[in-house]
Amino acid sequence: MARRLATASLAVLAAAATALTAPTPAAAAPPGAKDVTAVLFEWKFASVARACTDSLGPAGYGYVQVSPPQEHIQGSQWWTSYQPVSYKIAGRLGDRAAFKSMVDTCHAAGVKVVADSVINHMAAGSGTGTGGSAYQKYDYPGIWSGADMDDCRSEINDYGNRANVQNCELVGLADLDTGESYVRDRIAAYLNDLLSLGVDGFRIDAAKHMPAADLTAIKAKVGNGSTYWKQEAIHGAGEAVQPSEYLGTGDVQEFRYARDLKRVFQNENLAHLKNFGEDWGYMASGKSAVFVDNHDTERGGDTLNYKNGSAYTLAGVFMLAWPYGSPDVHSGYEFTDHDAGPPNGGTVNACYSDGWKCQHAWPELSSMVGLRNTASGQPVTNWWDNGGDQIAFGRGDKAYVAINHEGSALNRTFQSGLPGGAYCDVQSGRSVTVGSDGTFTATVAAGTALALHTGARTCSGGGTGPGTGQTSASFHVNATTAWGENIYVTGDQAALGNWDPARALKLDPAAYPVWKLDVPLAAGTPFQYKYLRKDAAGKAVWESGANRTATVGTTGALTLNDTWRG
């Protein structure tokens, strides 16, 4: 849900410009084995299309979710996309032709498309929308008039009162009366128009602010039974409207999952995650959509976000490895102003440039999509933890994952259910040999993970591991540190974090004062890099001097023996 204020969601709604006839009532259709969605928040449709071809399809993502496509109020802020004024596809992110081209391109790459859909309300204020449509609150020519709005014309102010939550105005936005047949038909017409362009599913923004029966009636007019629905219904203890009410219509986003991941990764022990999911009181796994963060929560602070470094990355690794719910991988942009809209108006010229974070393409996360697909349907097996922040577990005989959220390396012999043989650790790009009894010995550096699966048996082509010509750079730097400090490396390659201190790679201090780390890089790659140190609070200090330079050899690993420059 798009929230202009921290406590409320901005949902922008919906009737359709083109009235299409809907066939049979639609049933919720879960994504299936490829159940990971990349949420490309505020990406232009042309940029989404390139991502489907270049990264999402090859990584094995099942879906891409795009931001609301309909015409909306003008303004640079991100939340303008969630204040619609019509149902023309004429927003900041592209027109109808660009949208259709994106859908076709993503389908060709094997990626289905989910459209974020705002059908609870319309924009407040007055003016001209991004597609040229004039509007004022309660009057949207050719679509809605005041008679189509709920009678309550004041803002929601009591979440303990069902009528207040579902009939009054979310942050002052014009609330549609979804109990009326005409309103339901117009909303369904908009969604059917998107289906006619090839859309495969919808995220229903602010579902909580519409009665579940109204959404059921609307969905019965949409599609042919194969449409995927994912509904935003934020859990609030003691509130009158609960997310579970919407399970009959489709999947529901389980916000408690993300909040609890933040608490565990920041204040508790990962060992507590052994029974994470339904045993924690969550909704049924098969009907839940989960995430580490989304566009609202990363700004509101109730979940982890990209500013939390390795905790954020490892939480994503865990989510993709753990068999609960259907995961969303949020992929947005850097911000200091919580209202700031997308860089370049949504055009992504390149990942990791202009502030685009591209979490969907981070090697630590994209490599886990293939693991999740391989392990689909497999139970958790061979759980191990140290009572603290080091855990490991298998997914039947298909996969095994270890996560080290502590400040020192984890070195042990792990018991997996994997068949014996060679595997690629898709987190590091290093080969791991599993014995005939399923055991293997490995070191997992602090703040990193290890991930093996039967779809990635070698690191030099095949499976989902690094491709042919992959070798590595072995960083060794002599650096003395104070208590609580650690040494990191970053550089001009995606595998090195693209000069982003938040994504810099932590070196292993096992041979202190020499810190070491092997990083997979393509053979023959020239690159620049530099070391930095971070204190316990995460404050970074760069070493002095110019950027260091090196080139990976065509065969074998490149070893760099450096000394910290004070």
UniProtKB/Swiss-Prot annotation:
One BP annotation, GO: carbohydrate metabolic process
GO molecular function, one term: metal ion binding
Family: Belongs to the glycosyl hydrolase 13 family.
Native organism: Streptomyces limosus (Streptomyces albidoflavus)
Lineage of producing organism: Bacteria, Bacillati, Actinomycetota, Actinomycetes, Kitasatosporales
Name this protein carries in UniProt: Alpha-amylase
SUPFAM superfamilies found in the cross-reference section: (Trans)glycosidases, Glycosyl hydrolase domain, Starch-binding domain-like
Site (Transition state stabilizer) residue list: 296
CDD domains for this protein: AmyAc_bac_euk_AmyA (cd11317), CBM20_alpha_amylase (cd05808)
